[in-house]
A protein has these predicted regions:
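AlphaC helix of the eukaryotic protein kinase fold
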Residues: 29-39
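Conserved short submotifs of the Hanks-type protein kinase catalytic core
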Residues: 57-70
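ATP-binding glycine-rich loop module of kinase domains
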Residues: 1-31
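Activation segment signature within eukaryotic-like protein kinase domains
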Residues: 93-94
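Conserved C-lobe activation region of Hanks-type protein kinase-like domains
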Residues: 173-203
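Short beta-strand micro-motifs within the conserved protein kinase catalytic domain, predominantly
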Residues: 48-60
Length: 203
């Protein structure tokens, strides 16, 4: 799709809620939080939202800079030697992810759900961080305990909207402690997958 004024190619994302009643409202609120948060984050290594979330009949749409693949797709393709990401591409991609996380951490923010689905590649081959619905401010964490409580309704959300515990820091899952180290653990899982044909370290 092209924007009418700039003629830049963009990616249009569409989501159709599947829940009913109160949980449908929670599902829509989660989607709005994700897109709104992403819209407010301005950094070259974070996915740029170019058109805000809009309701269209029974679905919701928004547009971002042009995306060609998620890292989940790229890592799956890497199983095939013919499509394996080379060392230079991996170095560039992980450096860009590190810069995005550094930007968040400097602002006292933690992504808390860095997975292969929350990293995408644009048309230029740049890796972009996205999926910011669970972005957590350290200012909201109790200073005496350093703990953060899960939202109860998260478990009732559709699977695609829940945290992916395969990438979650055990300190976060077991002790519910939030900090930049949560994202570093998840980044390590991604790096392992990228260098081991998409296999996770505990498989």
């Amino acid at each position: 799709m092209e924007q009418a004024l700039t003629r830049n190619t963009v990616s249009v994302w569409m989501y159709t809620p599947i829940s009913r009643g109160v949980m449908r409202t929670k599902e829509i609120e989660h989607l709005k939080r994700d897109v709104t948060t992403l819209s407010r984050l301005r950094h070259p290594c974070i996915l740029e939202v170019v058109e805000p979330l809009e309701e269209c009949r029974s679905s919701y749409l928004f547009a971002t800079e042009h995306v060609v693949a998620s890292s989940h797709e790229l890592l799956q393709d890497s199983v095939d030697p013919a499509h394996q990401l080379d060392e230079v591409e991996l170095q560039k991609g992980f450096l860009q992810l590190a810069r995005a996380l550094d930007f968040l951490h400097d602002a006292k923010l933690v992504h808390t759900n860095l997975t292969s689905m929350s990293v995408v590649m644009n048309a230029k081959g740049d890796w972009k961080l996205c999926g910011c619905a669970y972005l957590t401010s350290l200012a909201g964490v109790q200073s005496d305990s350093g703990r953060w409580a899960y939202e109860e309704e998260e478990h009732a959300l559709p699977e695609v909207m829940r945290r992916d515990m395969d990438f979650a820091d055990p300190v976060y899952v077991i002790d519910r402690r939030v900090g930049p180290y949560n994202d570093m653990y998840s980044l390590g899982i991604l790096f392992y997958m990228a260098t081991h044909h998409s296999a996770k370290p505990y498989q």
